[in-house]
């Protein structure tokens, strides 16, 4: 993980240079736990408001429309890096030294897998055939291309569209991870395309975790470029009631308390 918040010691760790979106998100977690008393980490009316949002058919329509636009962006970025990957690896395949390295890598992989699977008591000839078909030069190149495309697409999204990623995860939290797991359906029962997000397994843990992610994502949106536009997009999707609950909690319960802490420090000449 490039950037994460440790809630046992309230420290944000940045392991390597990371995207601003990640840093602002994890700092949002820290502010949430630092500024708000444990018993007030979730608004008292959170469950009721979220329930109304989920039951509102207009919200689902807004989510589906947003996801369609989001997918256009990600698909265009993926296609750009797919074309780049094709060119890079086509050039590599014309390099004799690179081809030799691939063959050596594949040979080592095949030997490792033979050793790993020998206890399955598969006849040696059959095992060799299975493993050799799994680890071909073509599959190795395709795998490297997929890694290149996925990593660069994610990096590009976090750098230039971090606010949209945060919106996706807020929606994912509201629908308990169904969006990112591809299980959210529209009024006609058709699946809505999946987006980034923490997923069902994470969001089924408890309400505090879910709301903490909503606040952390909101904090990231506020700090990132195009904040005003992205906040309006979020408001149009989740509705005024849900948006106001998040915004009021962030501005009043978190930032207000944090300012009071700073004022307290100032009144003591910078010392506690």
Language model features with spans:
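Active-site-flanking segments in enzyme catalytic domains
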Residues: 1-272
């Amino acid at each position: 993980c490039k950037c994460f918040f440790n809630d046992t010691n309230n420290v944000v760790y940045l392991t390597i240079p990371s995207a601003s979106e990640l840093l602002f998100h994890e700092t949002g977690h820290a502010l949430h736990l630092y500024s708000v008393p444990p018993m007030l980490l979730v608004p008292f009316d959170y469950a009721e408001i979220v329930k109304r949002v989920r039951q509102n058919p207009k919200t689902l329509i807004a989510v589906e429309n947003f996801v369609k636009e989001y997918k256009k962006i990600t698909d265009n970025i993926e296609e750009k890096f797919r074309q780049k990957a094709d060119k890079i690896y086509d050039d590599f395949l014309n390099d004799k030294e690179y081809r030799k390295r691939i063959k050596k890598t594949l040979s080592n992989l095949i030997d490792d897998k033979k050793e790993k699977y020998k206890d399955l008591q598969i006849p040696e000839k059959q095992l060799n055939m299975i493993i050799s078909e799994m680890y071909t030069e073509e599959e190795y190149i395709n795998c490297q291309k997929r890694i290149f495309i996925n990593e660069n697409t994610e990096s590009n999204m976090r750098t230039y569209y971090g606010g949209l990623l945060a919106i996706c995860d807020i929606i994912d939290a509201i629908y308990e991870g169904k969006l990112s797991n591809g299980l959210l359906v529209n009024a006609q029962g058709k699946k809505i395309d999946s987006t980034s997000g923490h997923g069902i397994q994470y969001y089924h843990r408890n309400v505090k975790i879910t709301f903490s992610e909503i606040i952390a994502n909101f904090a990231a949106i506020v700090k990132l470029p195009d904040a005003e536009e992205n906040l309006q997009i979020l408001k149009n999707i989740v509705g005024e009631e849900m948006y106001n609950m998040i915004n009021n909690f962030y501005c009043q319960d978190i930032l207000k308390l944090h300012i009071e802490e700073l004022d307290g420090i100032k009144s003591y000449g910078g010392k506690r």
